[in-house]
Amino acid sequence: MDIRNEFLQFFHNKGHAVYPSMPLVPNDATLLFTNAGMVQFKDIFTGIVPRPSIPRATSSQLCMRAGGKHNDLENVGYTARHHTLFEMLGNFSFGDYFKEEAILFAWEFVTKNLGFKSKDLYISVHEKDDEAVKLWEKFVPFERIKKMGDKDNFWQMGDSGPCGPCSEIYIDQGEKHFKGSEDYFGGEGDRFLEIWNLVFMQYERSNDGVLSPLPKPSIDTGMGLERVQALLEHKLNNFDSSLFAPLMEEISDLASLDYASEFQPSFRVVADHARAVAFLLAQGVHFNKEGRGYVLRRILRRALRHGYLMGLKEAFLYKVVGVVCEQFSNTHAYLKESKEMVMKECFEEEERFLETLESGMELFNLSLEHLNENKIFDGKIAFKLYDTFGFPLDLTNDMLRSHGACVDMQGFESCMQEQVKRSKASWKGKQNNADFSAILNAYAPNVFVGYETTECCAKVLGFFDSDFKEITDAKPNQEVWVLLEKTPFYAEGGGAIGDRGALLKDDEEAAIVLDTKNFFGLNFSLLEIKKALKKGDQVIAQVSDERLEIAKHHSATHLLQSALREVLGSHVSQAGSLVESKRLRFDFSHPKALNDEELEKVEDLVNAQIFKHLNSQVEHMPLNQAKDKGALALFSEKYAENVRVVSFKEASIELCGGIHVENTGLIGGFRIVKESGVSSGVRRIEAVCGKAFYQLAKEENKELKNAKIALKNNDVIAGINKLKESVKNSQKAPVSVELPVEKIHGVNLVVGVVEQGDIKEMIDRLKSKHERLLAMVFKKENERITLACGVKNAPIKANVWANEVAQILGGKGGGRGDFASAGGRDIENLQAALNLAKNTALKALEG
């Protein structure tokens, strides 16, 4: 049975609108991941947005519960039901039908469509919900209905807001397999399994805890697809169902182990985590050091550790992830489209961790021998595993689980705090919270007038030294912080540097403004004092002319993000930025280097919007209204209820508090000067506009003129080609480079990197020297990695070998069975490419 389709069709026939699964990354700053079916309807339930015209909905929602409040990660593999990623089937009523219909629909679907026997079904209700008891008694005898308290049968969205009792349908799996003391209805055993939760949202809880009836009660239900699939197949464990069979087969083949072996928990961990990795990567989450990216990294590393237990010492998870992409390609087409990218990024992350996994495991095993009698694992060692070897804390605890031990959290946290102190970013002098507390008590937030003007009269409220201790006056040649009653200087934020400028007194320059920062809601400017100033002085604050150039680069950054999303896809999201007067730097999520065609398209799109002379528009509106308009926002930012929205007509709309040009025409022009990788899944573009754009054009024109003179040819390309030919002819002998040769099963294996020389000639020399050969030589040149490979009387084709390795470098290979070449721009992946080249060759030789 196709349970998903059966469920959606059933409720569609009952007048429900069918909604697609929303992304795993919700447009909700309070959630790390989408963790329930009701998330996409949250604003409807809370009344933020009006009810839809069809007040009934149904969906099959992909959910993630790993990290944050809802975190099942540590239980996966050890229980029958826990998953990081699962599908939640649900039906919803927005003030339309209520308990009677919800119970009727649920009973009909469970007994008729799913075919569960009514004698095996049990019901739980809230202890005060007599109405639900009476409704259930139409289908179930009273002795199979159990009243429970708030802990089990009362649901609420938060400390205040919509809430209500809930009712759950349980199924008796039979006493044949469950004979524990807790295996009774209402006990802690697994015999009676919850399959469907019906939430009756009928109250509003006020801030002081008082419950008031809602004028239009609603329904929210949830049922796990994986759980139902296992029940229909009479399996006692979700992982034993046909949903996971293709994954178990792949893992079994890779590890040469049987699923029913002692490694069964590890099979289940790898299968579950492969699903999570595939969907998260395909939906634009990338491996990172924080936030969702770090949760993804933790999931992958936990899977690798369980693979290690099964003897898998090389990258393997990417192959299981590939099976996930194929398995779900019919219901989630984007998995098929992004399969290559997903597998590549997974492989690269595996390679990075495998470099330290072996050493980390050695340290872990050695430390196990010194466990104290309380089985407390040294917190300092746990921190070293985390900090040096990349072992997330929950991974270390997971490894300790089988030894009945746990980490000394106090020791771990102590090491973490020490590291935070060492690495904490600081400006000249360090923040002193006690001093800031005194400042905040003494001064109200100063008024920022920089949106309206670049100059204003202002009163000096106070001066502060580098430790933010208040001083009464400022003397020439001192560097001090100043707090003005009102200020036109924009504080560093949103990637833009702080304003610079000057303070005038009596028509003379009294201080140079070096920088502006916001600390705890107060805008401070850093001054270099030229003329003595004191508290209470009236000054004229002037913003430097470079403000306009910063604004040009800031507006260009907005246009750049929109262009990237149009060219590369909606998975692109900001990962960091820097906006200065002479350049911009924009970091964004994308799995591979941009090729020349993509870069040209992005640059052309930005310039097209500049040449349209689009006016900027600044609006203030509620956060949800801004999101509904499609405004881009940073998940890491905490936004107020009302936000500032900057748009350039249809070209760009973002939440932003920064300074922008009034018209895109003022940007002048836009040029990308560099594209590079920052980390796995994060790319960086550096660009210029405005005066810097003009200056770059001047410099390039000058270089072009000098090149013509040097080449003695007005046609530079022709001159360069002539010079290259001359150099080639002048080379009397090839560069001799000796690379290490390994002999394996009679075949000479060469994999290495050279700094100079013709790598194709090197391959030819190696082929003439050896009767049996597998050789791949890499060379770094012009921000690219090129490779050449040769095969002679060996069990692999050169073109297949080269193409597989080239994908790691963000490129493709081509050639014949005996010789091939390739290249790519992901130079940061050179080591991973070397590892893959050698491992592929070794497998071919071993096979």
From Swiss-Prot:
Please report which protein family the annotation says this sequence is part of. Answer: Belongs to the class-II aminoacyl-tRNA synthetase family.
What this protein is called in its record is Alanine--tRNA ligase
SUPFAM superfamilies assigned: Class II aaRS and biotin synthetases, Putative anticodon-binding domain of alanyl-tRNA synthetase (AlaRS), ThrRS/AlaRS common domain, Translation proteins
| Annotated localization | Cytoplasm
| A Pfam family that the UniProt record links to this protein | tRNA_SAD
Upper classification of the source organism reads: Bacteria, Pseudomonadati, Campylobacterota, Epsilonproteobacteria, Campylobacterales
Q: Which reaction does it catalyse?
A: tRNA(Ala) + L-alanine + ATP = L-alanyl-tRNA(Ala) + AMP + diphosphate
Q: Would the keyword Zinc be found if you checked this record's keyword annotation?
A: yes
